[in-house]
């Protein structure tokens, strides 16, 4: 039974989202109960008509018209009540799933950066989109259908016991068999449904990977190989789906129809034990009608069992994201004043990797100084910058900002005072103004001043709508250098105390590099500046250059001091000088 999920705890958590809509839910249930009752009363009227009017040949027109009118009113009432309950349940479902989706999205936004390093993005997207849509079925389809079916079963059984309790006992025999079928279905369907949800997320992940890497795929003619990768996941999803369908086809409708036929045969067998005339024709008609009606909610319940299992499995995946550990930040909300950094005995390794990426790092960076981290690929430069940003929790050692442990500083203070410009900046499909402010309440005049600082004001003025001009998807109407300048402008409007540039000039032309150099010269007076350098020519004026090799500090000093040592930095600088 280990492969079964904790059904009731997950269902209970999902139903909590319906709790704020209690009044609507009660009204919907009243409509549902009234509609089901109206639906069941019809055969009783017909039974009365057969027994008391038709069989006795007392065809009074007024009585017949009254029965017909009542029957039509009951059917119309049933239709309207079922319509209104359906509208209410759908409204509750949409509002509940909207809240659930917001919670899932919030949980995704609160995930530690390390989770995005190890978890496929497609899996997370699937939890926010596909899985929440599967849970929606619980609110707008499964819940109302199950409740309506259960109400119908009880009302039909009550009516059957009222008419003839011997025959009703025979009909009651079907219920334990149905419960057995549902338990067997749950046992075999749960692991299959898990696979279905997983493979669907895998398809999303591989498709996302393919779209993002389309340039490389087409450049190296790898379309067929990536098509095969998606096809493999799609085939696995298809096979798991087919197993579910075969299980549905065997355990649900056909088996229930067979059970109903067996009950009908039992009725016929039961008749042989009663004397002729013991049953009225109207009662017999009502029982046969109710048996057919009883079959419908039972089939509906077993069919919804499949949808319910999908919703529960989707809920399990959603809550695995919501309940996943969040990165812990401190509670100190005092703003940083100087931007002084002190790194003491820091060693670090990523999750699922026992080898240290950084080992025994000790650095002191004074306020408003210009420091550069250099080293070959894999030396630990970006990891060290990410630790200063507070992206990863420290395992060994301490980092102090303004003599306060980074673990004690609140998330809002950390994000406001320590900012980073990455090598591949993110540009949103929105206006230039929004891309800089990101929704923060920043005056337009201040934004223009920052644009002047980063030498982008002329570009923005040349655009049709100026600062409110729309940028294309991922900033496709901007050059790489312009994106970098925009990213620098984005962080400068916040006046950070510590600014980190992670190889921000690695992929740009020399002209844009000079603009960025001018920008850095103008802002270094206001904040502590840390640059992860690819081009060593950009850090010649740094107050201190720290050379990393295999996660260790091997050299530090000014540009001139390191050249004098003629060691690692000297070799790197000479190599680049000869290269250019």
Swiss-Prot record:
Pfam families: ABC_membrane, ABC_tran. The keyword Transport applies. Its EC number is 7.6.2.2. It comes from the Bacteria. Keywords: ATP-binding, Cell membrane, Membrane, Nucleotide-binding, Translocase, Transmembrane, Transmembrane helix, Transport. The chain crosses the membrane at residues 26-46, 61-81, 150-170, 173-193, 247-267, 268-288. Residues 25-310 form the ABC transmembrane type-1 domain. It is found in: Cell membrane. GO terms for molecular function: ABC-type oligopeptide transporter activity; ABC-type xenobiotic transporter activity; ATP binding; ATP hydrolysis activity. It is an enzyme of class 7 (translocase). Gene3D superfamilies: ABC transporter type 1, transmembrane domain, P-loop containing nucleotide triphosphate hydrolases. Its main location: membrane. It catalyses: ATP + H2O + xenobioticSide 1 = ADP + phosphate + xenobioticSide 2. Residues 341-575 form the ABC transporter domain. It is a multi-pass membrane protein. ATP binds at residues 375-382. One of its GO terms (cellular component) is plasma membrane. Belongs to the ABC transporter superfamily. Drug exporter-2 (TC 3.A.1.117) family. This is Multidrug resistance-like ATP-binding protein MdlB. It comes from Buchnera aphidicola subsp. Acyrthosiphon pisum (strain APS) (Acyrthosiphon pisum symbiotic bacterium). The lineage of its organism: Bacteria, Pseudomonadati, Pseudomonadota, Gammaproteobacteria, Enterobacterales.
């Amino acid at each position: 039974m280990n492969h079964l999920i904790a059904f009731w705890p997950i269902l209970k958590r999902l139903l909590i989202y319906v709790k704020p809509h209690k009044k609507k839910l009660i009204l919907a249930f009243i409509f549902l109960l009234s509609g089901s009752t109206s639906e069941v009363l019809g055969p009783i009227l017909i039974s009365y008509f057969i027994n008391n009017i038709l069989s006795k040949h007392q065809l009074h027109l007024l009585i017949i018209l009254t029965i017909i009118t009542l029957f039509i009113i009951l059917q119309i009432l049933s239709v309207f009540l079922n319509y209104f309950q359906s509208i209410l349940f759908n409204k509750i479902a949409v509002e509940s799933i909207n809240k659930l989706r917001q919670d899932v999205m919030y949980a995704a936004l609160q995930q530690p950066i390390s989770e995005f390093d190890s978890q496929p993005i497609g899996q997370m997207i699937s939890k926010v989109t596909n899985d929440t849509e599967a849970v929606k079925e619980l609110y707008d389809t499964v819940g109302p259908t199950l409740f309506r079916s259960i109400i119908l079963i009880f009302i039909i059984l009550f009516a059957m016991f009222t008419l003839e309790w011997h025959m009703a006992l025979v009909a009651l025999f079907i219920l334990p068999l149905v419960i057995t079928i549902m338990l067997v279905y749950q046992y075999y369907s749960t692991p299959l449904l898990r696979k279905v949800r997983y493979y669907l997320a895998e398809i999303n992940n591989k498709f996302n990977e393919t779209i993002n890497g389309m340039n490389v795929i087409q450049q190296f003619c790898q379309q067929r190989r990536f098509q095969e990768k998606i096809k493999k996941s799609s085939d696995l999803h298809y096979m798991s789906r087919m197993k579910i369908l075969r299980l549905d086809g065997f355990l649900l409708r056909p088996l229930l129809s067979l059970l109903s036929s067996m009950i009908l045969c039992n009725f016929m067998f039961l008749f042989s034990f009663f004397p002729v005339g013991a049953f009225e024709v109207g009662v017999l008609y009502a029982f046969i009608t109710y048996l057919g009606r009883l079959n419908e909610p039972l089939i509906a319940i077993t069919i919804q069992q499949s949808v319910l299992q999908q919703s529960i499995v989707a809920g399990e995946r959603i809550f695995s994201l919501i309940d996943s550990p969040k990165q812990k930040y401190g509670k100190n909300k005092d703003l940083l004043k100087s931007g002084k950094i002190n790194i003491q005995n820091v060693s670090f390794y990523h999750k699922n990797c026992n080898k240290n990426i950084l080992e025994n790092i000790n650095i002191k960076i004074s306020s408003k100084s210009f420091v550069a981290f250099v080293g070959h690929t894999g030396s630990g430069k970006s990891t060290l910058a990410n630790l200063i940003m507070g992206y990863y929790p420290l395992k060994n050692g301490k980092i102090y900002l303004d003599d306060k442990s980074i673990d004690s500083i609140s998330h809002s203070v950390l994000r406001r005072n320590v900012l980073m410009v990455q090598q591949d900046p993110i540009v949103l499909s929105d206006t230039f103004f929004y891309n800089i402010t990101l929704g923060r309440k920043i005056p337009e005049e201040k934004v223009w001043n920052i644009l002047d600082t980063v030498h982008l004001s002329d570009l923005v003025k040349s655009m049709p709508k100026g600062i409110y001009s729309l940028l294309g998807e991922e900033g496709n109407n901007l050059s790489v250098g312009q994106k970098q300048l925009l990213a620098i402008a984005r962080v400068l409007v916040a006046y950070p105390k510590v600014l980190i540039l992670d190889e921000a000039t690695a992929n740009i032309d020399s002209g844009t590099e000079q603009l960025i150099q001018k920008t850095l010269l103008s802002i270094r007076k206001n904040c502590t500046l840390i640059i992860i350098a690819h081009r060593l020519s950009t850090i010649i004026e740094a107050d201190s250059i720290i050379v990393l090799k295999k996660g260790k500090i091997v050299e530090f000093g000014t540009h001139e001091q390191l050249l004098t040592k003629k060691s690692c930095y000297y070799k790197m600088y000479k190599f680049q000088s000869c290269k250019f």
